[in-house]
C-alpha cells in the first residue's frame, strides 16, 4: 500500500465533512482485524461536537488537532460487553485482571492501526495521540466509561490541509533479530542512530532544547523519568478504577 509507505501524521484538517457513511464503512472494514478468540475486545467513542472535542482537549494537553479535526475517535479496551454477554448466558466471566486488560488493549490497538491504514488509503489524514494513556481518568470521566472499559488510543481524523515531509525511521537491521535476541552493543547503537542524529532537523532539535545530544531531547525534555513515573501511577489508578487491577 503506497499510503503506508508515504504516511505522515496530519495535524491540520480542511473544512470538509467526514460523512457518517464513510466513517462507518471504515470502522466496519477495520473490524476484520485480528482479535483474540473473535471476541472483539474494543469499543470506539466517536466525538464530532465542538463541545465534546473541547471537553477532551485538556486530557491531550490541548493539542490543537483535537478541536481542529472533524472527528476524534477514542478507542477503548472493552471487556464489559463480553462480560455482560457471558453473565446473561450463564457464563462465569473472570476478566477483572491485568491479563484481560492486555488482551483487550491488544485488540483495541490492532483495530486502531487497521482503521488508520484504511482511513489513509481512502485519502483521510490521521494523527495518533499517545497522550491517551497519560491522563486516562480525565478521558474516562469525560466519556463516561464504565467498569472494564479503558481508553488506550485516540485518533484525530479529517481531510488533510497539510502535506508534511516523511519523518525518519531507523534502519531495518535495528529491529530484526534472527533466531534469538542479540543485545545491542555500543557499536550497533552508534550504527543504528547515526543517520537520525546526522539529520539537520534533529540537530536543530538539539540546539533549540539547549542539550548536547538528541537522546537528551527525549530523556530530559519530552519524556522525563519524573513524568513517566507520575503518569504510571495515574494509569495504574485508572486500571483499578475501571476494574482491571485489584
Regions found by a protein language model. Name each.
Residues 1-246:
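Acidic, surface-exposed loops and disordered segments
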Amino acid at each position: 500500500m503506497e499510503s503506508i509507505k508515504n504516511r505522515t501524521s496530519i495535524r491540520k484538517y480542511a473544512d470538509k465533512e467526514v460523512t457518517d457513511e464513510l466513517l462507518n464503512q471504515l470502522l466496519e472494514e477495520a473490524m476484520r482485524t485480528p482479535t483474540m478468540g473473535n471476541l472483539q475486545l474494543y469499543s470506539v467513542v466517536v466525538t464530532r461536537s465542538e463541545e465534546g472535542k473541547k471537553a477532551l482537549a485538556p486530557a491531550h494537553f490541548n493539542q490543537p488537532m483535537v478541536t481542529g479535526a472533524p472527528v476524534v475517535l477514542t478507542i477503548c479496551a472493552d471487556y464489559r460487553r463480553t462480560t455482560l454477554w457471558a453473565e446473561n448466558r450463564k457464563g462465569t466471566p473472570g476478566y477483572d485482571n491485568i491479563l484481560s486488560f492486555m488482551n483487550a488493549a491488544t485488540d483495541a490497538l490492532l483495530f486502531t492501526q487497521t482503521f488508520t491504514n484504511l482511513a489513509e488509503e481512502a485519502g483521510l489524514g490521521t494523527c495518533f495521540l499517545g497522550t491517551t494513556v497519560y491522563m486516562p481518568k480525565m478521558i474516562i470521566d469525560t466519556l463516561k466509561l464504565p467498569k472494564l472499559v479503558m481508553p488506550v488510543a485516540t485518533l484525530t481524523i479529517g481531510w488533510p490541509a497539510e502535506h508534511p515531509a516523511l519523518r525518519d525511521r531507523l534502519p531495518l537491521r535495528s529491529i530484526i533479530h534472527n533466531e534469538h535476541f542479540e543485545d545491542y552493543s555500543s557499536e550497533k547503537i552508534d550504527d543504528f542512530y547515526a543517520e537520525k542524529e546526522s539529520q539537520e532537523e534533529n540537530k536543530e532539535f538539539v540546539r533549540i532544547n539547549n542539550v548536547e545530544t538528541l537522546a537528551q531531547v527525549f530523556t530530559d525534555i519530552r519524556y522525563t523519568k519524573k513524568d513517566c513515573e507520575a503518569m504510571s501511577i495515574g494509569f495504574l489508578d485508572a486500571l483499578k478504577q475501571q476494574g482491571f487491577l485489584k
